[in-house]
């Protein structure tokens, strides 16, 4: 039995957004050292194959989270194209950053990250020392989001928006500009 291809609508405008190098860089330079060093010494369980599989899964999840920003920026653009078009046309990245940034939403996200890290970061092998022997500290997860995940997601959103008008005819552009928010 074969499963037919799903026919999903094209949501995103054609683009060439790619921050994979930045994702790999912060993963290898920040995340890996955090989870492989204890008491100042590198840990080595000699499970290299398993480690590679976990690294690929982690990198894939991080990239998926960051690249999802394109769908978020497309949604924001569609909600009020007239607000975005001038900033896109002048390539004003600061204006685009202001249009996509919602500080209250970011704060809620950071609170959720902290809460989830508190729960999922526990080391349940040693229940009497669970708080002291965490797999990862909640504050470190929040810092990763503040320093890497959120900024890279915004970079993806802005890079996508800068390409959002590419290939549109003058009539299509005029229709977008005249659409009420």
Where are these regions (language model features)?
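Extended amphipathic alpha-helical regions
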Residues: 4-181
């Amino acid at each position: 039995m074969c499963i037919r291809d799903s026919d999903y609508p094209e949501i995103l405008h054609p683009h060439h957004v790619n921050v994979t190098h930045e994702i790999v860089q912060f993963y290898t330079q920040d995340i890996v050292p955090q989870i492989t060093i204890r008491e100042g010494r590198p840990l080595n369980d000699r499970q290299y194959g398993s480690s590679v599989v976990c690294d690929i899964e982690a990198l894939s999840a991080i990239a998926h989270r960051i690249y999802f920003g394109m769908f978020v920026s497309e949604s924001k653009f569609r909600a009020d194209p007239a607000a975005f078009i001038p900033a896109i046309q002048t390539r004003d990245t600061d204006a685009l950053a202001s249009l996509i940034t919602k500080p209250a939403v970011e704060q809620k996200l950071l609170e959720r990250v902290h809460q989830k890290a508190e729960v999922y970061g526990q080391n349940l092998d040693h229940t009497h020392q669970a708080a002291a022997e965490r797999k990862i500290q909640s504050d470190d997860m929040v810092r990763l989001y503040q320093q890497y995940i959120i900024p890279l997601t915004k970079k993806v959103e802005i890079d996508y928006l800068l390409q959002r008008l590419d290939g549109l005819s003058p009539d299509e552009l005029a229709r977008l500009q005249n659409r009420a928010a």
